[in-house]
Amino acid sequence: MRDGMGRLCIAKFPKPSDTDDVSAWEYVALQIARLAGICVPDFRLVRFGGRSILLLDRFDRSQAGRVPYISGLTAVQGRDGGSYSYLELVEFIEEHGSSPMYDLHELWKQMLLTCALGNTDNHLRNYGFLHDGKGRRLSPAFDVNPTQGDFDKSLSTAIDFDVRDADPRAAFGVREYFRLSAEEARHIASQTANVVARWKGLARKAGIDSRSVKEMSSCFECGKRRLREIAR
């Protein structure tokens, strides 16, 4: 669809069964990602009939037309329902990426935030690669959704081949595969923690009600705490 400015975008509507303002929380998560230095598509939140609708610009389109795109699942030659790891995306970037160092760092930042927010819907269709004429580039982050609670959450895509815990400390443990030193990873974790700490103000500016803010509090506070444990 096109928005009021004529820009090609994707509109994410709430489901009738949604009890929380899912689109608004995704909007908050995307704001956190952008403030943490993660590449995201341009996005905005609109209200219609008392419901939130998230609009995201299409990053697989340019003025010249369609930009070649494949999902992370296609990249690893996988199938729906299979079991996969971020390390398989690392291997794909190493073999096919036109800017592997940058994209490995970017993927690690995405993975770190996914862990901090308990984004358990991190299956490989929610990652993608564009073609820049020289090779593959990691796409901007999308479908970043925080999950309620501070309990242990299991990721759809594993950190490595054994660990599925949505824990930033697990992400820190595999940093070397992403060509990050301990010092670099701690710096990123510190910056990310400082942004996650702003979640409540971002939620209120997005118009999320106080009940939902209270219910999501443990998710963000736990993520912030675990990020700061890395940053020490």
Predicted segment positions?
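Small/polar glycine-rich anion-binding or flexible loop at a beta-alpha turn
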Residues: 47-49, 107, 187-197, 219
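C-terminal regulatory or interaction extensions
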Residues: 58, 62, 66-73, 145-152, ...
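C-terminal structured "cap/appendage" subdomains that terminate the fold
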Residues: 176-195, 199-204
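Conserved ATP-binding subdomain of kinase catalytic cores across diverse folds
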Residues: 1-81, 138
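A residue-level signal for conserved active-site and pocket-lining positions in enzyme catalytic cores
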Residues: 1, 33, 72, 121, ...
